[in-house]
Amino acid sequence: MIELPWPPSSLSGHAKGNWHGKAGVTAKHRVWAKAATLAARSMIVVPETGDIRVHVMFYPPSRRGDRVNYPNLMKPYWDGIADALHVNDSRFLPSYGFGEPVKDGKVVVTVG
C-alpha cells in the first residue's frame, strides 16, 4: 500500500497557467510517489508481462471536489510509481474508489 498526499488542483489537465509554474509541483509529486513506492516495494509483486492492477482510493480534504476529476490529478503519481517499479505506466489497469473526507486529504494506492 502506497500512501500519498492529496494532489493540488494545479496537477489537473484542466489547470490554467504557464507550464513552467506547474513543472515544479509535478516533479515534486512524482518524486514523492517514487519514494513512497520504493518504501513499500517489498510488499509489491509486479508481473513480468501484461497488465498491472492498481487500485486507487481517494480520501479528499473536503466534500467540495468533483470525484469525476480526481483521476486527472494522478499523472505525476503514475509516473513516480512506474519509475520505482521499472515499468511503463501504460501497463497499469487502474480502478478507483472514493472514501470519506479526511484532514488534508490523501491518496492510497494498492498495486497487485
Question: Where would I find each of the regions flagged by the language model?
Answer:
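Catalytic phosphate/metal-binding cores of nucleic-acid and nucleotide-processing enzymes, i.e., regions
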Residues: M1-G112
